[in-house]
C-alpha cells in the first residue's frame, strides 16, 4: 500500500505526494515547486515522476523548476493538452507503473478537453474533474462530457479514495444542501467538515462511497435532486439534470 501526503499550495490547492517505503516519490499536479521541494528535502525523498491531470497553471506551474532540480524525472500527463514539459503523454486506458503498482489513466474531459485522472492502489487522483461534494467548472468541455466522466469515476469501487486538487468541500456542501435541504447525511457531514476546517484540517481524501451520498453531481438519478431542478429542465434525462445543476452551481 502506498502512502500519500498533502502539500498545500496557493489558497486552496493540494499537491499530492505519493511515496513508498524506500523514499522514492511521485507528485501530482505541482502548481508550485517551492512547497514540493521543501517536503522532498524534509523527508529526504527522491522524485521519480510527476503526474499531471490537466494544463491549468495552478497544476503545472512548478513543473519546470522540478525538472531543473531533477533532470531525470518522468513527466506524465494528458496527450491532448498543451503541456510542453511532458516526457510521457498518456490517454484513456493507458497504464503508468508507480512503485510496482499499475495506475490506469482515465480520460475525464469536461473541465478541460484533455483532462485525465489516475486510478491505482484504490486511490483516484482526479484533479479538477471530481471534487468532494462537487465537480469542476466546464471551461472547455460540454456538460455531457463531464456527466460521462463523473459516471466513469463513480463506477469505480466504493472504497476508492478520492484525491481531488482543491479544498472546496465546505462551499460545495452549501450548494449540495440547497439542492437537498432534507438530506440528513449531508447535514451531519457538513458539521464534521466545518469542524475540520475550523481547526485547519483537510477534508480530503474523500471516498466514492461518501461522494455518492453527498455529491449532487453524482446523484442525478435521485428523486429529490430531480425535483430540485424540475423547473429548470425541459426533460428529466440525467444529462439534463446534471446540466441544470452545473448551471445553478455556476451562479450560486
From Swiss-Prot:
Its cofactor is Zn(2+). Zn(2+) 1 binds at residues 54, 56, 111, 128. It catalyses: an S-(2-hydroxyacyl)glutathione + H2O = a 2-hydroxy carboxylate + glutathione + H(+). Zn(2+) 2 binds at residues 58-59, 128, 166. InterPro entries: Clx_II_MBL, Glyoxalase_II_hydrolase, HAGH_C, Hydroxyacylglutathione_Hdrlase, Metallo-B-lactamas, RibonucZ/Hydroxyglut_hydro. Its EC number is 3.1.2.6. It is an enzyme of class 3 (hydrolase). Pathway: Secondary metabolite metabolism; methylglyoxal degradation; (R)-lactate from methylglyoxal: step 2/2. Belongs to the metallo-beta-lactamase superfamily. Glyoxalase II family. Thiolesterase that catalyzes the hydrolysis of S-D-lactoyl-glutathione to form glutathione and D-lactic acid. Monomer. This is Hydroxyacylglutathione hydrolase. It comes from Aliivibrio fischeri (strain ATCC 700601 / ES114).
Amino acid at each position: 500500500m502506498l502512502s500519500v501526503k498533502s502539500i498545500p499550495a496557493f489558497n486552496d490547492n493540494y499537491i499530492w505526494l505519493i511515496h513508498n517505503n524506500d523514499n522514492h516519490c511521485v507528485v501530482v499536479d505541482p502548481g508550485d515547486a517551492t512547497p514540493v521541494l521543501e517536503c522532498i528535502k524534509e523527508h529526504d525523498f527522491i522524485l521519480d515522476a510527476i503526474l499531471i491531470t490537466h494544463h491549468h497553471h495552478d497544476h503545472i506551474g512548478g513543473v519546470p523548476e522540478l525538472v531543473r532540480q531533477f533532470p531525470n524525472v518522468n513527466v506524465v500527463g494528458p496527450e491532448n493538452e498543451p503541456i510542453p514539459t511532458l516526457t510521457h503523454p498518456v490517454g484513456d486506458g493507458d497504464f503508468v507503473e508507480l512503485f510496482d503498482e499499475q495506475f490506469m489513466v482515465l480520460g475525464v474531459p469536461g473541465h478541460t478537453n484533455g483532462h485525465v485522472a489516475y486510478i491505482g492502489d484504490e486511490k483516484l487522483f482526479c484533479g479538477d474533474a471530481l471534487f468532494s461534494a462537487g465537480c469542476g467548472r466546464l471551461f472547455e468541455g460540454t456538460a455531457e462530457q463531464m456527466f460521462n466522466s463523473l459516471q466513469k469515476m463513480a463506477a469505480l469501487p466504493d472504497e476508492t479514495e478520492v484525491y481531488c486538487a482543491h479544498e472546496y468541500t465546505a462551499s460545495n456542501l452549501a450548494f449540495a444542501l440547497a439542492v437537498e435541504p432534507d438530506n440528513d447525511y449531508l447535514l451531519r457531514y457538513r458539521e464534521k467538515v466545518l469542524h475540520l476546517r475550523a481547526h485547519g484540517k483537510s477534508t480530503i481524501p474523500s471516498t466514492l462511497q461518501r461522494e455518492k451520498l453527498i455529491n449532487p453531481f453524482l446523484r442525478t438519478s435521485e428523486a429529490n435532486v430531480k425535483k430540485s431542478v424540475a423547473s429548470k429542465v425541459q426533460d428529466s434525462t440525467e444529462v439534463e439534470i446534471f446540466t441544470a445543476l452545473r448551471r445553478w452551481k455556476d451562479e450560486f
